[in-house]
Amino acid sequence: MDWRININMQDIKYIHYGSNSFDPIKFHPIKNVPFYTKPEGGLWASRTNKDFGWKDWCKKRQYHTEKLEESFQFIVAPEANIIEIHSCEDLKSIPQASLLTAMYIPDFESLASNGVDAIEVFISEDIALYDNLLGWDVDSILIMNPEIIVLS
């Protein structure tokens, strides 16, 4: 597998909005959604040090701003297996769920079953990612394995 894996994540802090704490019982396994670039399940977050993260996007678009009042921060375990997507070229290196669409639809179930704990997408580094991953509006991480979440 020729995926870009980030190994040194200990100093990177993430924030999840919509809840004040992480409840592993509420974590749902990853499930592909046909013809959609985002799966069901997992936990979504963005880096705390980003200039334009999820909180900023929600405020600008007036999207569920009431959910921004609750949040929790975490880091990921040092042994976490995380794919970083910085460009459309990176995106092409991961399994695709469907070839029947013009959009690139990652096979999240395949990634998770092959030991990938999370996927982090850097939309800000390649604007074409925004078009190819419709629905990924800002740089964000999708946690697919709850065991890598370390509360801070």
How should each PLM-predicted stretch be described?
Residues N6-N32, K59-S152:
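Active-site and NAD+-binding cores of ADP-ribose-processing enzymes
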Residues K26, I30-R47:
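A short, exposed loop/beta-hairpin motif centered on an aromatic-Gly-Thr core
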Residues E40, N49-C58:
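A short, charged, amphipathic alpha-helix used as a generic interaction element across diverse proteins
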Residues T48-N49, I123:
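Residues immediately flanking
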